[in-house]
Swiss-Prot record:
Catalysis performed (reactions): a ubiquinone + NADH + 5 H(+)(in) = a ubiquinol + NAD(+) + 4 H(+)(out)
One Gene Ontology molecular-function label: NADH dehydrogenase (ubiquinone) activity
Gene of this entry: MT-ND1
The protein, known as: NADH-ubiquinone oxidoreductase chain 1
PANTHER family the UniProt entry points to: NADH DEHYDROGENASE SUBUNIT 1, NADH-UBIQUINONE OXIDOREDUCTASE CHAIN 1
InterPro entries attached to this UniProt entry: NADH_UbQ_OxRdtase_su1/FPO, NADH_UbQ_OxRdtase_su1_CS
PROSITE patterns associated with the record: COMPLEX1_ND1_1, COMPLEX1_ND1_2
HAMAP family referenced in this protein's UniProt entry, alphabetically: NDH1_NuoH (MF_01350)
Amino acid sequence: MFLINLLMYIIPILLAVAFLTLVERKVLGYMQFRKGPNVIGPYGILQPFADALKLFIKEPLRPMTSSISMFTIAPTLALTLAFTIWTPLPMPNALLDLNLGLLFILALSGLSVYSILWSGWASNSKYALIGALRAVAQTISYEVTLAIILLSIMLINGSFTLKNMLITQENMWLIMMTWPLTMMWYISTLAETNRAPFDLTEGESELVSGFNVEYAAGPFAMFFLAEYANIMVMNAITATLFLGSPLSSNIPYINSMTFMMKMLILTTTFLWIRASYPRFRYDQLMYLLWKNFLPITLALCLWYISIPISLSSLPPQL
């Protein structure tokens, strides 16, 4: 029974990630006035499965001078973390209803840095190492902003539990009163998942492919799946925190459908941004965080602390 539960949890995520790759290629294709994949299956719908089959039947090569254990562990760790981070999300019921769901998500997103660092270091390649160091610096930097925004949300919510976020937003979405935080959160999630215009780790003109340049076949596919699973989970968290489904409906399917629609719209916006914006320069990326986002988020965090106290009101759970 445990194995069936695990499969019922993992397989939908894998299918969602597979079709996200197809949606991305279709969106980019139509934005560039072409069709995208349209040969394999009707309208190219079987393209992700053909790609997966091709990748997993190829021989996984590795450099002679690489560290075997770390080189193998890094993609496995990346995919495991990408799947585990889904567990506390209320859709509308969570697989694990944790009391400290927000902290759990923050901790796991921080751990993903290790898989990137290990893959870059174990490859024993200059390009891979530079890409990994860039990714680590970028991810750790933007996690500071994400943590402060989560702290502000927690102060409004009065709890670390994600289920309470939906209760807090029964009457009004949190985006209405915290729209500056929402904008900064969304841009920070772009940087956190290494997506355009912040994909400095995969700068093809500079670093060939970044930290995963030496990976091929199955391990490369695992990194690819982890990246897209992280994109989806970040948008799921955004939908929960700022666009929480109201619990007015007693039918769980309706809540799940509205949640998935919000997540799909946010994910499509990720793809739209990729098609529209050029890549940032690395110093501009860091300047945006440390000189712009950090002071504003700190000021807003103090604002959200002081307002309830000054108005003599406390969060609903206290």
